[in-house]
Amino acid sequence: MTKPGIIFGNLISVAGGFLLAAKGDVNLVLMLASLVGLSLVVASGCAINNCIDRDIDAKMQRTCKRVTVTGEIAVGNVLAFGLALGVLGFSILALFTNALALLFAVIGYIVYVGVYSLYMKRNSVYGTLVGSFSGAVPPVVGYCSVTGQMDMGAAILLLMFSLWQMPHSYAIAIFRFNDYAAANIPVLPVAEGMTKAKLHIVLYIAVFALVSALLPLAGYTGIAFMAVTCATSLWWLAMALKGYRHGVDMQRWARQVFGFSIITITALSVTMALDFQVVSQAPLLTLVK
């Protein structure tokens, strides 16, 4: 109901953004509040999303046994539970973090529940693009909890995680193609075909690789992050290009792209948490002049 896998993934990205901004000077109370508060907000969004999606979930093999579909738990109870989680999560962020971190959490929540779940997912091929913003909010909330300002580092994180969401989501849409088609959800592979979806996956991974490299180039992380982002992004890109091989098994290929997307973003979140740059260190761009 609250999708623990999604919550855990967001915890890693929140921690990555927080520790990147903290630069070794970690306020444990603030970090814990950011992690718990954002996790509750994400859990709230997932629970309410299940209420909204119960009609289309009934048509999909992957989701047809959710409690909101089977009636095991009344929809009203799930909705009340989700709202309670949201109130608690936003309250923690309001009490312990700052206005900017709270604002990003609120905007991300509204976009996911109000814009994506209620309308875009069902009606537009651009639903994935809109939803990618919400998926990119957690590391920015973690980062802004420390800094209290929207600087270049926060902007890079927002763009980087938004770009990552696209090939990750398109890969899911390919290996779950039959589910999305049955529910008449206009994700890119269903609405415009596999060829276009494959192209978008490759292009988004390429741009993601370039944007990820901006963190070390702008002085927010060091050489270790640059090495990890180059290695993982190039491997992911090479894997995506295999989709153009003659006779490729699209289901298997999409699962590989999806699986490595999780490895990539986890590796980058952990590395940026450890390889932050302190003020006395020079950005990589200044070292190559």
Swiss-Prot record:
GO molecular function list: protoheme IX farnesyltransferase activity
Taxonomic path: Bacteria, Pseudomonadati, Pseudomonadota, Gammaproteobacteria, Alteromonadales
EC number: 2.5.1.141
Keywords for the protein's UniProt record, in alphabetical order: Cell inner membrane, Cell membrane, Heme biosynthesis, Membrane, Transferase, Transmembrane, Transmembrane helix
Entry GO CC: plasma membrane
Identification of the protein by name: Protoheme IX farnesyltransferase 2
Keyword 4Fe-4S carried by entry: no
Compartments, record wording: Cell inner membrane
Entry-linked InterPro entries: Protohaem_IX_farnesylTrfase, UbiA_prenyltransferase, UbiA_prenylTrfase_CS, UbiA_sf
Transmembrane segments: 4-24, 28-48, 66-86, 99-118, 124-144, 155-175, 199-219, 221-241, 256-276
Listed pathway(s): Porphyrin-containing compound metabolism; heme O biosynthesis; heme O from protoheme: step 1/1
Classification via Pfam families: UbiA
Other facts noted in the record for this chain: Carbon 2 of the heme B porphyrin ring is defined according to the Fischer nomenclature.
GO BP of this protein: heme O biosynthetic process
Reaction catalysed by this enzyme: heme b + (2E,6E)-farnesyl diphosphate + H2O = Fe(II)-heme o + diphosphate
Keyword tRNA processing on entry: no
CDD domains, per the entry: PT_UbiA_Cox10
Function, in words: Converts heme B (protoheme IX) to heme O by substitution of the vinyl group on carbon 2 of heme B porphyrin ring with a hydroxyethyl farnesyl side group.
UniProt similarity note: Belongs to the UbiA prenyltransferase family. Protoheme IX farnesyltransferase subfamily.
